[in-house]
Amino acid sequence: GVVMYTTSSITATLGFPKDMWIGRSFIDFLHPKDANTFASQITNGLAIPKIVNDTQEKAQIFGTQGSTMVCRIRRYRGLSSGFGVKDTSVSYMPFLLKFRFRNISDDKGLVVYLVIQTVPFFSAYKTPNEILTQEVSFIMRHSANGNLEYIDPDCVPYLGYIPQDITNRNALVLYHPGDLPFLQEVYQAIVKEGSVTRSKSYRMVTQNGHFIKVETEWSAFINPWSRKLEFVNGKYYIIEGPANPDVFESPDPEKTPKLTEERKNQAQICRDDIIRIMNEVLTNPAEIAKQQMSKRCQELALFMEILQEEQPKAEEEFHLQTQDVDHTYYERDSVMLGGISPHHEYNDIKSSAETSLS
């Protein structure tokens, strides 16, 4: 889609002259990694049908609530970087995009426009190793094989990651290698008990390569049919910020801690053990689900047995009641409504009809 209008805040935020975007494609200003995600979300919204009065009509795109996503938008290359030198390198800034389609009438008739509101993200930390005084949390979910399935967009200013960059990657890589033995015990408790109350603090890596400290409340979903763990949910409470407070800064290999090959191998062994635990350990929730399923089957079998025993008696009683009811209502109808009865003579029928009409 071609940009038709921008607000003046684009200059203060990204450095572009106000009208520089006019007539150009919005996707051209997005980070290459985010362009496909943006286009896919818009396309999916356009493809959603709406059923009204049993007929399929064109959907009101994204409903009344609109839709959101996180992506990076390019900064203006002409921004001055000091001493009259202009930075010609391409840089991007993360934003939360809120967008919806609107139908607008103009000289060409009814035209559909995409309206996008952008909210910039800034690092939530001001100082190195900042201790957070207010409670801040985000949600993350991964499958039994460790693949990250969902991460809360609220985590962006605290971790620095764009959600689509780390989705479908190994979530266990986010944990500090030195804390993996402790987390291995935590995961054993998760799969055995189904949940774990708020854990003690451990470290999680941010986008810039430094670590924050978090405490987590864990819960697991056990499939009642397969009795296997499907996924693990975690609510992560941030306790302490990273040594480098700018989580959006590119990682510096010289400043980030390096691991020896031995430490890397030990960390990978721990991750493999955690995945094995999630897929092999027999869990208490699974046993409970198995017992509940067995109990329900027994109750259903008992109910069907009782129902079959009572069916002949019930049919006999129903037959007798039906005969009495039919006879009673048959006589009552002929008297109250003046209905035609084969037991009455024609004169009686005429008299009854005249009486009911008067």
From Swiss-Prot:
Forms a heterodimer with timeless (TIM); the complex then translocates into the nucleus. The keyword Cytoplasm does not apply. Involved in the generation of biological rhythms. The biological cycle depends on the rhythmic formation and nuclear localization of the tim-per complex. Light induces the degradation of tim, which promotes elimination of per. Nuclear activity of the heterodimer coordinatively regulates per and tim transcription negative feedback loop. Behaves as a negative element in circadian transcriptional loop. Does not appear to bind DNA, suggesting indirect transcriptional inhibition. The gene is per. CDD domains: PAS. The keyword Ligase does not apply. Its main location: nucleus. It comes from Hyalophora cecropia. GO terms for biological process: circadian regulation of gene expression; entrainment of circadian clock by photoperiod; negative regulation of transcription by RNA polymerase II. One of its GO terms (molecular function) is transcription corepressor binding. Keywords: Biological rhythms, Nucleus, Phosphoprotein, Repeat. Phosphorylated with a circadian rhythmicity. It is found in: Nucleus. InterPro entries: PAS, PAS-like_dom_sf, Period_circadian_regulator. The lineage of its organism: Eukaryota, Metazoa, Ecdysozoa, Arthropoda, Hexapoda. It comes from the Eukaryota. GO terms for cellular component: cytoplasm; nucleus. Residues 1-120, 138-240 form the PAS domain. It holds the Pfam family PAS_11. This is Period circadian protein.
